Amino acid sequence: MDKKTRVLRSRYVMAGVMGAAVLAAVAVAEQATAPHDPTDDYGEFYVRPEELASPSVNRIARSLRLNRQAMVLGKKVYDEHCASCHGADLKGIPDQHTPDLTDAEWRFSGDDLESGGLKKLPSDVEWTVRYGVRSGHENARGAEVNMLAFYPEFRTKEDTEDFGSDKFLTDAEIDEVIEYVLQISGQQADRAKATRGEVLFHDNTKGNCFDCHDNGGTGIDTFGSTNLTRRSSYLWGSDRASIRESIIKGRRGVMPAFDDKLKPEELKAVSVFIFWQAGTGESSQPTPSARENRRPNP
């Protein structure tokens, strides 16, 4: 092989190597910029978000395959639409009087989670998310139930029409009811006043508090009324001054309806996500054993 031939051959080899390097670089670049295929992560378990639109929210929560996607999408929806009021950690924001979604205190549903009851379903959460609380929607939670203001000047027009303009309790009687509420919530209270306050609390001609808060003040979930024995469930404060203001002025918490703000799959996903946070005490999905104790019904 003469010198000229060797030079030409070397150039061809070098050109081939450089060409291969260029092709490899292009392939790497294309791979880096190509959209991520989520099926690579989950394989046969992958569910596209829109597939959550048709199944019931209770079915989604029972299905490992559907639940996986619901938790991912639900967290995203929660962060975008719910965290501003309920907090990034789901524990509520005191200044906004929003409930802790990670505790065992459920409003507008069945038995308390701590009792092991199975009445609490993802569909309970879905209804609240979909229609809101006193949102103006015809299906809103709490539309027919408000905490009545015991001072007539703070009553709504509807309350005045239903209950009149009489002052049901004197200031002294309100003080006695406050002491009873402090006592059942584990706070220091005047025992003599609390004893008289207990009578007023259960008197259907005076305080009539038990009608919404139940005997002993444990609350009635279907009404969304506060469990007065748990200070953590007081959205408006549990000290004397806050309780007094609640009795005098009444309380009417609200939450917007998301029925026309979220896609069907988003609404169901965030409902499942919130359902699995309840009773965990932390912003994370429960362990399988904890989840098993709250397995949703069909």
PLM features per residue range, with description:
Residues M1-L73, Q96, F108-Y131, A143-L182, ...:
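Periplasmic c-type cytochrome electron-transfer domains
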Residues N67-K91, E126, A189-G216, I220, ...:
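Sequence/structural segment immediately N-terminal to covalent heme-attachment motifs in c-type
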Residues K75, G87, K91-R130, A149-T160, ...:
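Gly/Gly-Pro-rich "capping" loops immediately C-terminal to redox-active cysteine motifs
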Residues D79, A83, G87, W106, ...:
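Sec-exported extracytoplasmic/periplasmic mature domains
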Residues E80, P99, V145, G207, ...:
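Glycine-centered loop/turn positions within well-structured domains
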Residues R191-R196, T218-T222, T226-P298:
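Extracytoplasmic/luminal low-complexity segments enriched in Pro/Gly and acidic/polar residues
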